C-alpha cells in the first residue's frame, strides 16, 4: 500500500537541518522515508509500535529504523493519519 507522508513542523525542521549539517545522514533518512511511502513492512525498516509515545490525537505511534547498530542511530517516529493512506512523521531523531 502506498502512503502519502505528512510532517509535523518539528520533523520538517529536523529534515532541513540534516540536509545542511549532515548530508550523509540526510540521505539515509530520505531513503527510509521513501521505503515508508511504498512498503511499511520492508524488513530494513524494522517497524514496530512504540509504546512510550502517543500521536497528537492519542494515536498509536510507530518507530522505523534509519540506522541500526550505530551509536546515536536515527529513528523515524510516525502515526497513521489524519486521512486514509496517510502517515504523519512526528519526529526524526537519534534513538532515545
Question: Which functions belong to the PLM regions below?
Answer:
Residues 1-73, 80-96:
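Basic, Lys/Arg-enriched alpha-helical interface segments
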Amino acid at each position: 500500500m502506498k502512503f502519502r507522508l505528512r510532517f509535523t513542523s518539528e520533523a520538517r525542521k529536523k529534515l532541513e537541518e540534516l540536509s545542511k549539517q549532515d548530508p550523509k545522514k540526510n540521505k539515509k533518512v530520505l531513503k527510509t522515508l521513501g521505503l515508508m511511502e511504498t512498503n511499511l513492512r520492508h524488513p530494513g525498516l524494522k517497524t514496530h509500535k512504540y509504546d512510550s509515545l502517543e500521536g497528537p490525537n492519542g494515536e498509536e505511534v510507530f518507530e522505523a529504523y534509519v540506522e541500526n547498530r550505530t551509536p546515536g542511530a536515527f529513528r523515524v517516529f510516525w502515526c497513521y493519519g489524519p486521512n486514509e493512506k496517510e502517515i504523519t512523521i512526528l519526529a526524526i531523531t537519534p534513538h532515545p
